[in-house]
Amino acid sequence: MAPRILVVDDSAVVRMALSQILGRAGLEVETAIDPLVAMDKMRRARPDAIVLDIEMPRMDGLTFLDRVMAQDPVPVVVCSGLAGPGSEVALHALEHGAVDVIEKPRLGVKGFLEDSARRIVEVVRAATQARLRARVRALRPLPRPPAGAQPRPAPRLAPRAGRAELVVVGASTGGTEALRVLLEAMPADAPAIAVVQHMPEVFTAQFAKRLDKLCRIEVKEAADGDRLLPGRALVAPGNRHLSVKRAGGLVAVVSDGPPVSLHRPSVNVLFHSAARVAGPGTLGILLTGMGDDGADGLLELRRAGAHTVAQDESTSVVFGMPKEAIARGAAVEVLPLPRVASAVLAWAR
């Protein structure tokens, strides 16, 4: 049976365009002109995913999102003109349960949607597979062991030649919250960190600024030539590749170039460069996300002597990228999200 998608948007043009795009991909599409109509339709038949605008009459999209997540969580993809450059609204949507964001221009919407059809279908299909309970488990602290219990021994890590120099992290769907959990747990003197998170162009700058306010380490959008230093995390800019080179230390390289593994930025680009440049001094981490970007790169890191970690299925919103890495034999450890940070700290000791 085809997944059921509910498109909630007050624009008839957008509803028609999205219905055609998703319908051609074999998805069953229902539409609603605003959230109140959507709630009535959801009472009759629960959708597998919702594509949601933000600015609508009678009830705005964020209020509707909060209600959906509180009452009967359904995977939501935000597709809105407000989800553009520097948008606090898009960050709010992701923090309150949306699994992904598609930015929509205010002019030429129909043409943009048609040009972006492949990404829209990919994101919405991934949303239908998202496990929102996994997101809750990932954000919940691990239970404390009972009094008197023997502490669990730290995992035995592969021998490392040289010092702990660089942590590289890749994520896609569900990754914004996973990255927050990971980076908030890092101490001020954590090893240098480079991050690729699949998200729209320019949106990454605001995402990095938000993380910087929450974390003890510095978090910023990477610029070409930035130094990768202890206590700093660099986030790949949207629509640009991030790699690393050695020039009197580790340096970020931000570049154009064709998509790799269907993505720009690509996790594979970052991981392959880290394997070449830092090898055994690297820890590679592949978090929740759709597709297989990063799986080959994580395997190359492991072959180069790096320690490698994949997020487990129980805490992944979409168990795509980590699953592919595990299938390739790329992961030394498979861990729930709350234990990934402790693995970083154990490795860095």
Curated annotation (Swiss-Prot):
Pfam families recorded: CheB_methylest, Response_reg
The keyword Cytoplasm is annotated on this UniProt entry: yes
Active site positions, chain numbering: S172, H198, D293
Catalytic activity: [protein]-L-glutamate 5-O-methyl ester + H2O = L-glutamyl-[protein] + methanol + H(+); L-glutaminyl-[protein] + H2O = L-glutamyl-[protein] + NH4(+)
Domain CheB-type methylesterase per the UniProt entry, residue ranges: 159-349
Documented EC number(s): 3.1.1.61, 3.5.1.44
Gene Ontology BP, a term: chemotaxis
GO MF annotations in UniProt: phosphorelay response regulator activity; protein-glutamate methylesterase activity; protein-glutamine glutaminase activity
Subcellular location, principal: cytoplasm
In-chain residues carrying the UniProt-annotated modification 4-aspartylphosphate: D53
Record keywords: Chemotaxis, Cytoplasm, Hydrolase, Phosphoprotein
All copies of domain Response regulatory, residue ranges: 4-119
Top EC class, one word: hydrolase
UniProt PTM: Phosphorylated by CheA. Phosphorylation of the N-terminal regulatory domain activates the methylesterase activity.
One GO term describing the cellular component: cytoplasm
Superkingdom assignment: Bacteria
Location relative to the cell: Cytoplasm
Family: Belongs to the CheB family.
Domain notes: Contains a C-terminal catalytic domain, and an N-terminal region which modulates catalytic activity.
Protein function: Involved in chemotaxis. Part of a chemotaxis signal transduction system that modulates chemotaxis in response to various stimuli. Catalyzes the demethylation of specific methylglutamate residues introduced into the chemoreceptors (methyl-accepting chemotaxis proteins or MCP) by CheR. Also mediates the irreversible deamidation of specific glutamine residues to glutamic acid.
Protein name, entry field: Protein-glutamate methylesterase/protein-glutamine glutaminase 1
Source organism phylogeny: Bacteria, Pseudomonadati, Myxococcota, Myxococcia, Myxococcales
